[in-house]
Amino acid sequence: MQNYKYDKAIVAESKNGGSPALNNNPRKGGSKRVLLICLDLFCLFMAGLPFIIIETSTIKPYHRGFYCNDESIKYPQKTGETINDAVLTAVGIVIAILAIITGEFYRIYYLKEKSRSTIQNPYVAALYKQVGCFLFGCAISQSFTDIAKVSIGRLRPHFLNVCNPDFSQINCSVGYIQNYRCRGEDSKVQEARKSFFSGHASFSMYTMLYLVLYLQARFTWRGARLLRPLLQFTLIMMAFYTGLSRVSDHKHHPSDVLAGFAQGALVACCIVFFVSDLFKTKTTLSLPPSAIRKDMLSPVDIDRSNHHNMV
């Protein structure tokens, strides 16, 4: 009877990661849960802080000069965009979160997988982890992008059209022109200095590649072997088209788009493999030998155990 009570205590402790304090003191467990959630939100805020500061402040990009014969910045400014910022953000985030909601629902309620999170509801815990990791990567990707834009200050392909400098006051024979004044609208001129690297390319590649890897980890149905590769191909092509549209819209140079693709892919891989648990090996919780009830063992095993104890 004493061994049986000890077994029940071990099983109860294992429900909360082997911590009897959390089982006996729900208030302490709740305060710890709130503290961990606040810490996660703080980390998410800090990851996106550079992006927030740059987008909401008057920080101006690096004032880069130009060559009068540079044909790469003489393109006309197009009205409108093939894919504007609102569409990019809405589609990228909505598709990703809907996919995560569906995938975690299938994993928790259909495959009956459990979560070791301090959050009691396993579905809520799974959503919290996966959506949180995804948004954390979004914040990192956008912060990287904006830091590069203001630090490098590369001129967009339509820069001269937006800047509209007074060439009568510029001596093009000196080569590289640094002292010049733009007659165009200042806000548009500052935006025309943020070519490297493409934010559309980096954000679209991050969100779509994250989804590709998420499908690889969660989409385990073997009924149609080509369905998952088709979905993954479609997602990558959506990101690819988004980046290419920035070149045809005269918003970015091809190298800006390639750099954006590389940055988005790098952040997605780092988040998936080093932050999330999508590809981590699942471990099963095993009880210590002392928690095994002796009445469930055969007489041979009991004699063998007694022999080892005597030795």
UniProtKB/Swiss-Prot annotation:
List all topological domains (Extracellular).
55-85, 145-194, 245-258
Q: Where is this motif: Dityrosine basolateral targeting motif?
A: 109-110
Motif range for Integrin-binding motif? Answer: 183-185
One Pfam family recorded for the sequence: PAP2
Q: Please give the biological process terms from Gene Ontology that the record holds.
A: Bergmann glial cell differentiation; blood vessel development; cell-cell adhesion; cell-cell adhesion mediated by integrin; ceramide metabolic process; gastrulation with mouth forming second; integrin-mediated signaling pathway; phospholipid dephosphorylation
- At which residues is Phosphoserine found? 19
- Enumerate the UniProt keywords alphabetically: Cell membrane, Endoplasmic reticulum, Glycoprotein, Golgi apparatus, Hydrolase, Lipid metabolism, Membrane, Phosphoprotein, Transmembrane, Transmembrane helix
- Outline the segment boundaries, as ranges, of region: Phosphatase sequence motif I: 149-157
The entry's active site is: 200 (proton donors), 252 (nucleophile)
Q: Where is this region: Phosphatase sequence motif III?
A: 245-256
| Superkingdom, natural source | Eukaryota
Looking at the record, which segments are called Mediates interaction with CTNND1?
Answer: 276-311
Residue span of region Phosphatase sequence motif II: 197-200
Q: Name one GO molecular function term.
A: integrin binding
How does the UniProt record describe the way this protein sits in the membrane?
Multi-pass membrane protein
Q: At which residues is there a site annotated Stabilizes the active site histidine for nucleophilic attack?
A: 256
InterPro entries the UniProt entry points to: P_Acid_Pase_2/haloperoxi_sf, P_Acid_Pase_2/haloperoxidase, PA_PP_rel
Q: Which GO terms describe its cellular component?
A: adherens junction; basolateral plasma membrane; endoplasmic reticulum exit site; endoplasmic reticulum membrane; endoplasmic reticulum-Golgi intermediate compartment membrane; Golgi apparatus; Golgi membrane; membrane
Pathway assignment reads: Lipid metabolism; phospholipid metabolism
Q: Which residues lie on this side of the membrane: Cytoplasmic?
A: 1-33, 107-123, 216-226, 280-311
EC nos: 3.1.3.-, 3.1.3.4
Report the subcellular localization.
Cell membrane; Basolateral cell membrane; Endoplasmic reticulum membrane; Endoplasmic reticulum-Golgi intermediate compartment membrane
Assembly, in brief, is: Forms functional homodimers and homooligomers that are not required for substrate recognition and catalytic activity. Can also form heterooligomers with other PLPP2 and PLPP3. Interacts with CTNND1; negatively regulates the PLPP3-mediated stabilization of beta-catenin/CTNNB1.
Primary role: Magnesium-independent phospholipid phosphatase of the plasma membrane that catalyzes the dephosphorylation of a variety of glycerolipid and sphingolipid phosphate esters including phosphatidate/PA, lysophosphatidate/LPA, diacylglycerol pyrophosphate/DGPP, sphingosine 1-phosphate/S1P and ceramide 1-phosphate/C1P. Also acts on N-oleoyl ethanolamine phosphate/N-(9Z-octadecenoyl)-ethanolamine phosphate, a potential physiological compound.
Q: Family, per the entry?
A: Belongs to the PA-phosphatase related phosphoesterase family.
Write the protein's name: Phospholipid phosphatase 3
Q: Which organism is it from?
A: Bos taurus
